[in-house]
Structures are given as structure tokens and as C-alpha cells.
Swiss-Prot record:
GO terms for cellular component: membrane. This is Short chain dehydrogenase MYCFIDRAFT_6125. The active site is at 168 (proton donor), 182 (proton acceptor), 186 (lowers pka of active site tyr). It is an enzyme of class 1 (oxidoreductase). It comes from Pseudocercospora fijiensis (strain CIRAD86). Pathway: Secondary metabolite biosynthesis.
Amino acid sequence: MTATYMNSSVPFMYDSYPAVAPERFQGQLQGKTAIVTGGSSGIGRAVCKAFASAGASVACIARREPRLKTLVDEIKAEGGKAIPLAVDISEKDAAKKIVSQVEAELGPVDILVNVAGIARLGPLVDEPEDLDIWWKVHEVNVRAPALLTRAVLPSMIERKSGAVISVSSVVATWPSPIQTAYASSKAAISKFHESLAAELEGTGVLSFALNPGSVESELGAPDDAINTASQHPMLEKMRQMLKSPRKKQTAQLPADVCVALVCDPRCKVLNGRHVEAAQDLSPVLEEAEKEGGGRIGKDRLYLVNIGIL
């Protein structure tokens, strides 16, 4: 089903569609190894299954081992290859340990998808003065993906091939009250990928940030995701919005877009961009392939951008 998005003429998608359909890329990643964080639920779980369906050997990373084992059993039952690694990615040396174990069991890493993330809702003025919980959002949403990226890059650069994708959010580009931690972390990860793509130019390694759309997830599930000590009126509005029965994107949609970004050679023109999973990729690619990148290049679209007079 399609609709419009932010007054854009590009169709707005809620589920997988022909341009990113799994059957397009089935088996294309045979012999490739992928690491996916946040694999025990939601988008991360769907991404693990999508890359396995495309033929990759997948290291499924999350904290909840029973859920990971169930996921890996499902992947194997469907003919795929996967291993579970129960790790808290925010822990010291987690990235090195993950990459070392994956390389030992599955081989060199070709694809990294950073899905794991946490949120924090509440006004900055009501946060504890040490901002420890606030900074934890950046530890998980920015530092951990950066460390994992740093750990996989040397091998990718040496082999002149690879792709790193991190899940960002629409709040990276919109003013988002009571989300200073989450919004700034997502703006940071989108800018991280833009800068990374520039410094990796010519290496064969691709870099993308991805706004998955409005997908049902456990992002706000932890007890400290909402600052319950705050009485800010926006908190109640946010609670009601999160509970509202509005139509959302399926987890399969961003998962399939991740695979398309890696498998479809046309997607190289979006290297370094903040890709919108809920937009039909076909017209976006057509515009990006025009001389100078069309409007996307001229107006610096799909980037965390500050315009000036």
C-alpha cells in the first residue's frame, strides 16, 4: 500500500514491494558474512532473516540469548546459516570480541548492520545532573556502532568490498522536544555515515544510514526509556501517540531495503545518504542517477543538512 510522505511525490510504502522484494536478491550473498545487532526482536530480527534469505551467513547479536537461539533455529529451518551471540554491545571491548568470534566461526565480515538502539523521553532540564542515562543513549546508538564499524573496516578495506548500515530515525532531521538524547544520537549516526562514505571513497566499502519508518518495536520498553519523574506535558502526549492505533511500517520493509542497499549495484549512488525505507527506492534512484545527482545532489537531499541564506 502506498501514500504520500512529507509532501513528497515519491510513494510512501508500508510493506515490502517489488523493487526490494526478497526474491530479487535470493542467494546473491552466498559466501558473505553479516553481523546484525539488535537481532532478538523487531527490525533487527527481520534484518537477520532477510540477509539469511539472501544467502549470507548471519551473526545475530543481542542480549537475550533464548530469543536469539529461537531466531537462529528458524533461519536454519529455512535453509539459512546463522549463529547467536548474546552480547551487550555497550560493554567495553564488545566490538572486538564480536568481530573476533564471527571471523573465527563464519569468516571475514562483509556486512555490518547496526540496528540495536535505545531511547530516552523527557526534557533535558528534568534529567539527573550527571546525565548518565542521557549519555547511555549515545553509548548504545553512536559509540557502539562506531566501535563495531572500526573493528570491521580494516578487513573490508583490504578486500575492497563491504557495507555498513546503521538504523537512524526521522528525528535526526526534525525538531523533537523531549528527545534531546535520542534525536541527537540519530543525527550523529546519520552524519557519521555521510562522513564515513567520504573518507572511504574509492575503497569499495559502502556506508548508509537508514530511517526505518514507523515500525512497532521495543525501543521504548526499558524502564528508563521514559523519565517518569518529569511532569512535562509532552510526555503524556508522547505516551498517547505511541499507543495510538495508527498504521505503521512492517519490520520486513526496512529489512528488505537493507538487503537491497547491499545487493543492488544501483544503490551505490546513495552511498553516505540518510535513506528513507518508507519511500519507494525506484524514483529515488532514478533521480540520484541523473547528472550531478539531480535534485538529490543539487539540494543535498537525504542528508542531515543545515541550509543558509
